[in-house]
C-alpha cells in the first residue's frame, strides 16, 4: 500500500487536430505503484471485452458525424443558389437554381444519405446480437449471436469511420468555400472524423482482426451465419418482382464474397503475408456488401403506411447504393 500520494501526474495537455473538447493528456507514472486487477497475464483478454464495446461505439461516433454533416449539407444545398440546371431552370422565380439540382451535388448528398441510413441498420443489427448474447436463454442462439457480433465488430468500426471521413469531406465540398471557413462548422466535422479511423484500433488493425482472426482463425463462423441469412432473404424474396433489382445482384455479391474468401485463404496458405496485403480491401468489400444487404431489407420493409415520399426516397437511395 502507498503511504502517501501516489506518484501519478499529468505532464501536459495534447494539442490535437480534432476532438478538442476531449482533454487528451500525457500522464507520468514514473515511481508510481500499480495494483494487479484480475489474474496475472490475463489483462489483454480482459481489455478486449472493453475494446470490442468501444470499437462499436467509435463506429457510432462515425455514424453520428455522417448524419450531422449530411443534415447540414442538405440544408445548405437547398438554400444556396448557383447556376442553372443543365436541363433548364428549376426555379425561374430565383436568380439561379439551388445547387441541389446539380447532379454531382446530388451524388455527394446521396453518398452521405446512403451511409447514414444503411449504417444505422448495421449498427442496430450489431447491437441486437449483443442483446441476444446478454439476454437469450438459448445457448445455441447466444453462440451464434456472439460469432455474428465478433464478425461484424471490425466492419462496424472500420466501415463507418472510413465513411465518416469520406462523408464529412463530401459535406464540406457541398459548402464550397464556406465549408473551409470555421464559422460554418463543417471543417470541425472533418477534423473530428479523422481520429475515428485511428483510436480503438486503426482500420488496418480492424482489417487484420476481420480477415486474420474472424475469418481464418475462426473458420469464418460469423461470415457463414451472415451469408446464410443473406441467402435465406434472397430465397424468400425471389418471387417478389418489386425487389428483383436488388435481390439478384445481392445473391451474386454474396457468392462472390464466399469465393473471394476462399481465394484469399488459399493464397494465405502459400504466403501468410497475403493476409496483410488483402485485409483492408477485403474489409471494404465486406462492408459494402453488408450494407447492400441491409439496404435490400430496408426496401423490403417499406409499406403504404410509410408514405409515398418516404418510400420514394428510400428506393432512390437503395438504387444509388446498388
What are these model-predicted stretches?
Residues 1-256:
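Internal glycine-rich alpha/beta core junctions
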Residues 217, 233-322:
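C-terminal amphipathic alpha-helical interaction region
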